[in-house]
From Swiss-Prot:
Phosphoserine modifications at: S86
EC numbers, comma separated: 2.3.2.27
Annotated phenotype, changing R332 to D/E/L: Increases strongly cell restriction against HIV-1 infection
Domain notes: The B box-type zinc finger domain and the coiled-coil domain contribute to the higher and low order multimerization respectively which is essential for restriction activity. The coiled coil domain is important for higher order multimerization by promoting the initial dimerization.
Keyword DNA-binding: no
Modification N-acetylalanine, positions: A2
Keyword Nucleotide-binding belongs to the record: no
Name of the protein described by the UniProt record: Tripartite motif-containing protein 5
Residue spans, zinc finger RING-type: 15-59
Family membership: Belongs to the TRIM/RBCC family.
Binding positions for Zn(2+) per the UniProt entry: C95, H98, C117, H123
Source species of the chain: Homo sapiens
Catalytic activity reported: S-ubiquitinyl-[E2 ubiquitin-conjugating enzyme]-L-cysteine + [acceptor protein]-L-lysine = [E2 ubiquitin-conjugating enzyme]-L-cysteine + N(6)-ubiquitinyl-[acceptor protein]-L-lysine
């Protein structure tokens, strides 16, 4: 009720020209009131057009001197500006300024207005339409914009998820690299510690040998000096004594003097000493990385028992050893032991058949004085020969192996020469530390077989290249005559 009264009052104090609340209101004799600025502008226009002034509402002429300020209306307008309409009066479908229904849409200003707003100076000359006419058009536009934004939101969420995934991946990768770096440098420190200890032991041994030799030389020189001193004293005594003393046994003295030979002591020139060379750290790191890389392909290898091999296999199929010696009784009951004939049957294959890919395994050969291990293309009965002479261990017969004899001689077996086809070409391997554990890496596609000395920090022992794998290949073990077992290591060992 109060809101309706306020709306009616507002209509009474609205300028008919600008349709706004009266500002500095002026009243004419006819009773109509206008803003001072609006009435002044209208007066000037009327005088130019007609030569007289008339009320813009009722067209009754007036004299400028009869215009008077309307203080009463000005006070009402001032009070009205201070009063806000109640929520009921401020309906969303009514103009907040004029109280009229919002039925029009101004295209230039993008606003919903009432018919009084349309006639005001603010919207004069603008393109206006009924709200019902433009609502559907803008609804379609807003729906399209909404769908586009939802699609952008989905893309943003997917990109956000990708970034989180990439962030987690990078974190995992860098953590993995950190772990590898720590492991590599820990190994490097172990090698440096070992090299330092080994070098110090060599120096201590060198010091012991040299000082012992020099001590012996010193003792000999002391003895020689004492003998010379005694001989000199004898000669001086003879020369200072009587004729009888001079001639008594003179020939023996002269002979002793002539036979004096000064034995020079053994010396050790410092310029001929072995010069210490610091280890190649870059090369060591490359070795670590190569071994770390191939160990990613570690497979769990076990042996496959068969009826033709005389090798002894453990229950878990990881240990292979030579058979125990047999007791033989000779003539007159003489008792002695001998091994069975180590022919082709002594070798044993791994159970894994390899036809592609990269494969790595390790064999523990600690405390063994003889062994052969590597890769074999399978047993070939038509190529059986005396393994005791190593005749069959050649790549052309399907063997890519290395071996140890007499506890120190490490060799690789290559193809024989044209002149001696039955004898493999033995390649002596320079191994500083005899391996207690050997790593074998087979790259089927690259046609290579590599052997690593795990005991000596993973240094490469030997590598077969250009291997011809025409059929499936298997891990190969031969314990030879040494009774100590050779063991296939598990990846977790």
């Amino acid at each position: 009720m109060a809101s309706g009264i306020l709306v009616n009052v507002k209509e009474e104090v609205t300028c008919p020209i600008c349709l706004e609340l009266l500002t500095q209101p002026l009243s004419l004799d006819c009773g109509h009131s206008f803003c001072q600025a609006c009435l002044t502008a209208n007066h000037k226009k009327s005088m130019l057009d007609k030569g007289e002034s008339s009320c813009p509402v009722c067209r009754i002429s007036y004299q400028p001197e009869n215009i008077r300020p309307n203080r009463h209306v000005a006070n009402i307008v001032e009070k009205l500006r201070e009063v806000k309409l109640s929520p009921e009066g401020q309906k969303v479908d009514h103009c907040a300024r004029h109280g009229e229904k919002l039925l029009l849409f101004c295209q230039e200003d993008g606003k919903v207005i009432c018919w009084l707003c349309e006639r005001s100076q603010e919207h004069r000359g603008h393109h206006t339409f009924l709200t019902e006419e433009v609502a559907r058009e803008y609804q379609v536009k807003l729906q399209a914009a909404l769908e586009m934004l939802r699609q952008k939101q989905q893309e943003a969420e997917e990109l956000e998820a990708d970034i989180r995934e990439e962030k987690a991946s990078w974190k995992t990768q860098i953590q993995y690299d950190k772990t590898n770096v720590l492991a590599d440098f820990e190994q490097l420190r172990d090698i440096l510690d070992w090299e330092e200890s080994n070098e110090l032991q060599n120096l201590e041994k060198e010091e012991e040998d040299i000082l012992k030799s020099l001590t012996n030389s010193e003792t000999e020189m002391v003895q020689q000096t004492q003998s010379l001193r005694e001989l000199i004293s004898d000669l001086e005594h003879r020369l200072q004594g009587s004729v009888m003393e001079l001639l008594q046994g003179v020939d023996g003295v002269i002979k002793r003097t002539e036979n004096v030979t000064l034995k020079k002591p053994e010396t050790f020139p410092k310029n001929q000493r072995r010069v210490f060379r610091a280890p190649d750290l870059k090369g060591m790191l490359e070795v670590f990385r190569e071994l770390t890389d191939v160990r990613r392909y570690w497979v769990d290898v076990t042996v496959a028992p068969n009826n033709i091999s005389c090798a002894v296999i453990s229950e878990d199929k990881r240990q292979v050893s030579s058979p125990k010696p047999q007791i033989i009784y000779g003539a007159r009951g003489t008792r002695y032991q001998t091994f069975v004939n180590f022919n082709y049957c002594t070798g044993i294959l791994g159970s894994q058949s390899i036809t592609s890919g990269k494969h790595y395994w390790e064999v523990d050969v600690s405390k063994k004085t003889a062994w052969i291990l590597g890769v074999c293309a399978g047993f070939q009965p038509d190529a059986m020969c005396n393994i005791e002479k190593n005749e069959n261990y050649q790549p052309k017969y399907g063997y890519w192996v290395i071996g140890l004899e007499e506890g120190v001689k490490c060799s690789a077996f290559q193809d024989s020469s044209f002149h001696t086809p039955s004898v493999p070409f033995i390649v002596p391997l320079s191994v500083i530390i005899c391996p207690d554990r050997v790593g074998v890496f087979l790259d089927y596609e690259a046609c290579t077989v590599s052997f690593f000395n795990i005991t000596n920090h993973g240094f490469l022992i030997y590598k077969f290249s250009h291997c011809s794998f025409s059929q499936p290949v298997f891990p190969y073990l031969n314990p030879r005559k040494c009774g100590v077992p050779m063991t296939l290591c598990s990846p977790s060992s």
